[in-house]
Amino acid sequence: MTKIAIVGGGPAGVMAGIVAMQNTKNKPNKLVEITIFDKSEPLKTLLCTGGGRCNLSYAESDYKKLVQFFPRGEKFLLSPFSKFGFKDAQEFFLKLGIKTYIQDDNRIFPISNDANDVRCCLLREAEKLGIKFKKVEISGVEKSTGEFSIYDVENNVYKFDKLIIATGGNRLRSKFSGYSLAKSLGHSITDLKPALCGLITIEDWCKKLSGVSLKNIFGKIIFNNKKIISLYGDLLFTHTGISGPLAYKTSSYSAYIDFNLNNPLILEINFMGKAFDDFDKEFLLKINENKKKKILSVLSEYFSKSMARILLDDLGLNSEDLAGNMIKNDRKKLVKFLTECHLHISSISKEGEIVTAGGVELSEIDNKTMKSKIVDGLYFCGEVTDVDGLTGGFNLQNCWTSGYIVGISI
């Protein structure tokens, strides 16, 4: 009998347990006992994914393109994703009774749009397979004489032949984490940074737009006059700055950039999705066609009236002036703002952290098996490794994939 411990009852850990147990059903001579340890209810974190709808994955069948959605771990994931991609995840869940559908933006959700349905189906399968769950907080681990000794916070000790660490990220700032367990066993941990979080802006006009959302906005990250990357996504204004997919992507790609109030990160956004010259011609034509209308009314054809007023006020332009009276310099000023608007980011909104950048050093893990190169019998899966994806189902796909790889390898 091989006894396997999984520390972490999130998507990756439960996936690893299910696949490992399913794998033994085809091997009568291989007897396995699996126990999943977690201080919280299993798969509790799954309930808030995708706004409660559970964004299971992203429909990109080319694994070489899929890995490009991961700011960290791109090369490492090539082998795992070539073995278990989004179609494999869909098939896995279909066998458990969860039908899925693909949105226009390629995000994948269960037909029910209910994360709890996904949670329940995974827990039913785990129970059917005989996987045990133990609600305790693990505080330490040792490896000696071929077995792992796992300690909980009450100093109880559990003996296992193999160990899977699947504790997820650093959002809860727990004293006892998968990082500390991995480190105690000789693994290196890269710098941990918040990722996929909201951003705090210096500009006040953003805060006046709190609650306003815009679709498919193009952006460009700039720091110290150097372009980092171009990106796009929906944008949500908040009482402290910005949130939503565009902000989340920005926070991930700038996770290791040392920006602050005195040396802010710049997110250049293009509200119009057109180059300065192209939109200038369009807006001039619009003005000439509506000379007797107020400039507020003309701009309100592109934005809500309240947003248009806030933008004009910030630029020092009188929203009550007639469009036909707008001078060239003011038009150019407005067009530049709408196509090359610089938002100065002073810091991240830490309470909104969705994933953690950083984790167990990837060079110390075999990406074909997710097995430790340092400690025999030790495996990793999920966000505890130095892998993090953008918003859109990528991080859950990493959980399903890495959990699957561990399950068939252990």
Where are the language model's segments positioned?
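Glycine-rich FAD pyrophosphate-binding loop
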Residues: 5, 21-51
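Conserved N-terminal/central alpha/beta ligand/cofactor-binding core
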Residues: 39, 44-131, 137, 237
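A conserved short coil-to-beta-strand element within the FAD-binding core of flavoproteins
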Residues: 134-147
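A glycine-rich dinucleotide-binding beta-alpha-beta segment and adjacent secondary-structure elements
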Residues: 135-136, 309-388
